[in-house]
């Protein structure tokens, strides 16, 4: 742990974007996507999410970052905190499902590899829960 602590930054980058749910497209809107910002990345390297949002906006993509999305759940899952992980998974599935019904998402994007991998497993994780499995499969198809 001592070696890992030495790798931690002594200060964190300043966040440049406002904490909002909708980042509108510049010019003609051609798509609407949700972005999973990641619980660690948005604190350690917020410039990655900020650059992603600016790039998408510049190319006519509206970006939705739902405030209800806390974490993809993989961190809790890897730490063995299964109840917390399942709470994160369930929250995300329901939030994105409702967001899609509300305004038709063209995609759910993650620029964090661990989160992206976890999202693809939601349907499998809830294979015994018909309602969540159906919603998770819909989310996977977006």
Residue ranges and their predicted role:
Residues 1-142:
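Iron-sulfur cluster-binding electron-transfer modules in prokaryotic oxidoreductases
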């Amino acid at each position: 742990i001592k070696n890992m602590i030495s790798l931690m930054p002594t200060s964190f980058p300043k966040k440049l974007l406002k904490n909002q749910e909708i980042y509108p497209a510049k010019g003609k809107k051609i798509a609407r996507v949700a972005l999973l910002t990641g619980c660690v990345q948005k604190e350690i390297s917020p410039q990655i999410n900020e650059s992603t949002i600016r790039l998408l906006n510049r190319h006519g993509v509206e970006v939705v970052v739902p405030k209800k999305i806390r974490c993809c759940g993989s961190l809790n899952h890897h730490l063995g905190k299964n109840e917390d992980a399942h709470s994160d998974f369930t929250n995300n599935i329901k939030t994105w499902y409702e967001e899609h019904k509300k305004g038709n998402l063209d995609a759910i994007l993650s620029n964090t590899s661990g989160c992206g991998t976890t999202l693809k497993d939601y349907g499998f994780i809830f294979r015994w829960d018909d309602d969540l499995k159906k919603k998770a499969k819909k989310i996977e198809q977006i």
